[in-house]
Regions:
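Short, surface-exposed amphipathic charged segments that create phosphate/polyanion-binding patches used
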Residues: 35-44, 103-106, 184-189
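Short beta-strand/loop segment that forms part of the nucleotide-sugar
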Residues: 1-2
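Active-site-proximal specificity loops/subdomain of glycosyltransferases
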Residues: 6-54
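Short, surface-exposed beta-edge/turn micro-motifs
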Residues: 86, 118-120, 156, 195-196
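A short acidic, often aromatic-flanked loop/helix-cap motif at beta-alpha or helix-coil junctions
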Residues: 29-35, 96-97, 175-179
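Surface-exposed acidic, glycine/proline-enriched linker/cap segments
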Residues: 97-112
């Protein structure tokens, strides 16, 4: 819902660099601001509703991706995919069957036991989405205090409740989730492979943060950044207490002790002020 002069300059340069056309759609999000939000998720999580409705009768399908997803493979199979008549969207599940069963019980929708999906990747059948009135029904549910009490991931939970049994499930390579804070563990399993098409950098630490850009898993983002007009743009520094805390942890993990302890000191100062 914002597009400044600097944004225009960079996107103009990107379009010229790759000899393509980029369309920017500005959304008026005022009506969405009253819906449930958290410190991590603003009203922008509901823009996917507007996107799906806007492209009805303009495009038969729309690929929605969260902004913390990077592409490292071909999307041709998605471009060529044809939906069956009653399927609303293609999604990728997260978690295992026991997690799906828990979410089905918590949200009161039995069909979720067949698969609970992450809403960061949605290939949307715009005709069926509109026929099912998904956006209007989702907003109505998010305005119901009884439903809001049950949900933990506002847009995602409601979409799972509405779309159970109306989905087709894609391979995990189209939404491979990875938290850069896994790097703080002694050991972890990296789910990203050479076959991964979309890496989804979940969690508060992102590859554009200056404390996390140098991990191997961040290099897909860095390669894209370096091949774009943003190549000389500085990475983001920690600005709030949460970011300072994670920055400190990552710096200490990488044995950059001065930066690590310095950010811990700034973190404690910020916490004392609030």
């Amino acid at each position: 819902d914002y597009f400044g002069d600097d944004d225009r300059k960079y996107f103009d340069a990107l379009a010229r660099q790759y000899k393509t056309r980029i369309k920017i759609y500005l959304i008026n999000g005022d009506r969405l601001r009253s819906l449930p939000c958290t410190k991590n998720w603003t009203h922008a999580i509901y823009f996917r509703f507007v996107i799906a409705d806007y492209f009805f009768n303009k495009a038969p399908k729309v690929l929605y991706l969260d902004a913390d997803i990077i592409c490292q493979g071909t999307i041709e199979p998605l471009i060529n995919y044809t939906f069956s008549e009653h399927t609303v969207a293609m999604v990728v599940t997260e978690g295992q069957k026991d997690w799906w069963a828990k979410r089905a019980h918590s949200l009161g929708v039995a069909g979720i036991a067949n698969g609970y999906f992450n809403s960061g990747f949605l290939l949307i059948n715009t005709n069926q989405w509109t026929n099912e009135r998904v956006s209007a029904r989702a907003i109505a549910m998010l305005s119901d205090p009884e439903i809001v009490k049950k949900i933990t991931h506002p847009d995602q939970d409601v979409l799972n409740m509405l779309l159970a049994d109306k989905l087709v499930y894609a391979d995990i390579k189209y939404n491979t989730q990875f938290s850069l804070n896994y790097q703080l563990k002694e050991s972890f399993k990296n789910p990203v492979t050479n076959d991964t098409v979309f890496i989804h950098y979940i969690g508060p630490t992102k590859p554009w943060h200056d404390w996390a850009w140098d991990y191997p898993i961040s290099q897909a983002f860095m390669a894209a950044k370096n091949a774009s007009p943003w190549k000389d743009t500085a990475l983001l520094k920690p600005v709030n207490s949460n970011q300072l805390r994670y920055s400190a942890k990552h710096m200490l993990k990488k044995k950059q002790y001065i930066k690590g302890f310095g950010n811990y000191l700034l973190y404690f100062i910020k916490k004392l002020k609030h």
